[in-house]
Amino acid sequence: MKVGLFIPCYINALYPEVGEASYKLLTQLGVEVDYPLDQTCCGQPMANAGYERDAKALAERMEALFAKYDYVVGPSASCVVFVKEGYPRLLNDYREHACIDSRIWEICEFVHDVVKPTSLPARFPHKVSCLLYTSDAADE
């Protein structure tokens, strides 16, 4: 399985160690991970501020950039939920959806539901994001 690691813009700018830790975790679990260097923002800040055209352009870019991966995994529930729930509306005329549905996962969901390790060789202080509980993604 080939995974495209989606590192949201705010994590890249403010918490780069989260991106590095995400990469290390996935590779240590035996996942083939690629980090597309050309990735930018998923478009959530623009969509939230009402700039739909700008958000759509970023969504189309992200869809094209991550089209070749079996899964897209990101360490931000907020951005993952935006892609799952916001992209179908933004991209209603866009034919090829690379990330929609089961292809994009929040990293903890992906490790638990897809990779399914029997053990982790480390302590894992994990907190489930409250956003996952209030979104449609929580039902999946």
Describe these PLM feature segments.
Residues Y133-E140:
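Conserved small/polar residues in nucleotide/adenosyl-binding loops
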Residues L37, I104, T118-S119:
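Generic preference for hydrophobic/aromatic residues in regular secondary structure cores
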Residues K2, K127-S129:
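Residues that mark the start of a beta-strand
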Residues A98-V114:
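Short, flexible loop segments at boundaries between secondary-structure elements
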Residues P117-K127:
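Short, structured loop/turn "capping" segments at alpha-beta junctions
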Residues K2-C99, S135:
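Cofactor-cradling patches in redox/metallo enzymes
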